[in-house]
Curated annotation (Swiss-Prot):
SUPFAM superfamilies: Thiamin diphosphate-binding fold (THDP-binding)
Subunit relationships: Homodimer.
GO molecular function, one term: magnesium ion binding
Gene coding for it: menD
Species, as recorded: Prochlorococcus marinus (strain MIT 9215)
Keywords, alphabetical: Magnesium, Manganese, Metal-binding, Thiamine pyrophosphate, Transferase
Protein known as: 2-succinyl-5-enolpyruvyl-6-hydroxy-3-cyclohexene-1-carboxylate synthase
Amino acid sequence: MTSSIECKNFLRSLQLLNLLIKIGVQNLIVCPGSRSAPLAIAAGELNKLGLVNIFNSIDERSAGFHSLGISAASGNLSLVITTSGTAVSNLLPAAVEADRSCKGIIFLTADRPLRLKDCGSNQTVNQEDFLSSVCRRVLSTNLNGLHETQENEILNLVRIIEKQISTFPGPIHLNIPIDKPLGISFLNKKNVLEVFKRIYLKKKYIFQEFEIKSDKKKFLEISKSLNLDESGIILVGPYQGSVNDLTSFNKSLERLQEITGWPVFADPVSGVYSDLRGLVVNWELVLRKNKNSINCHQLLRLGPMSSSIDLEKFLINFEGIQILIKEKNYRKLDPIKKSFEYDFGLSNFTTLLIEELSINEKNKKSLIPMALDLIEEGEQIKEILKEKITQDNQITEYMLANRVPKLWPAENPIMLSASSPIRDWLTFSENGTLTRNCFSFRGASGIDGTLSLAVGIARIKNPLLLVTGDLAFIHDINGWLIENSVDMNLTILLIDNNGGNIFNRIYKENLKEDELRKLFLMPKEINWPKLAEGYQVNFKNVANFKKLREALDWSISIQKSVIIKVDIDPENEIFEKNALLEKIIGS
């Protein structure tokens, strides 16, 4: 009986992981634990066969975010294996972000069998409930143990996962009760592997193609209010689709712009290509300067709203139609509640629009006068920024947002951490992110998992530049404990403002200095060179943009993880930025 259970645990683990690989899993993160041993051992064997990449992480929280970074950068499903108990609870922050950013990730969590539940058994908790509020599906193998799960039950579970990911991507929790024995002898492992390779490895399985059918009636209801002969603006927020669909997304956006002639405001993480006609540079500053004089009555909004107070005010006060087009995201996405929402994506919307209006495929409108005016406004602001921001300036956060896209090679990816970096880049980067893949996890917009996410992205797309504040970075320092993270071609631009500088901008005028520091800034006196040395990560401190350029070139050349620290004076930052904004708005 003992031999039978250990062999069935191992065989079912092999079958499950093999099927998940067949629906797109290429990368797997395994965390330590005994209860998950059959899954981990099976993953190791499939890795030996060259079927899946495996990386380990001793911290489940980091593992979840690492897997999410891989999913975002690759466009493929990623997978995390954990043991039971509190290990599962540590997956929640990554599950929250995966839910809100619509990224496919599977959490395989080992559990105790039903007979050990609700009786005080060690390390036995209600883990099947921990992720239920944010996961697309919560599934389970046989509650009495994996060894009692039938082959067809495993296949059905994988088909459910595949259908869910195809229609509405996000996190999926598959809880797997496993009874002892958890390990397997060398002889039994050899015998089970022979059976698996002979019968199951090359077996063909049928997975249904799921086509998302659009709602023509809903499209007609929404689009009838559009008048393409009148002025409008296309607003492109953070991209929530798969990176694998970016090309078709941009082709549809290009066609939409051609048939309207409208200007385009693109978020730094919109995924929009830099050569799109009609792009308005410095559009947030243009909005701030011309908030009451932009004359149009229709907006096409793609994806969630950018993190911009000026844009939010503009949308709230906008008197006209707003259409919000979403990419495989069926929840409400409009916090100001003024738009008609269309769930079926830009490609579908553009195709139906062309069909409905019988637009000639070769039809291409000239840029409308308003577009030309807004583009010219953006270029004028660009000249002011060029005059005020030079390589001789003392480094500030807003200057980094403007200069770094020009210093980092145009084709190399960038990740922006949450909090102040994404806001500064929205305002000052001058569309400098649009020549490359640019990532920022705007689903829940937390600072959680910053380093682990970056390491995950760098496994797929590198050399990667992570731009992060000091608190966001130190919050996830366990990311360095992910297997071979220090060997990634990853450059970390560490903005050291000795605390959460975004709170300086929000609360400085209303709090005493000691209150501000204790309650919001929370500065940490960290010896950064020693910290980097402890993790065997290369480190440099730079004081000006000339040295920063040299350091960035050096970081790419050594092809390993590097920390480049720049020190920011928050007082100087606020003073200089306010003076610059006054000059721009008053020009």
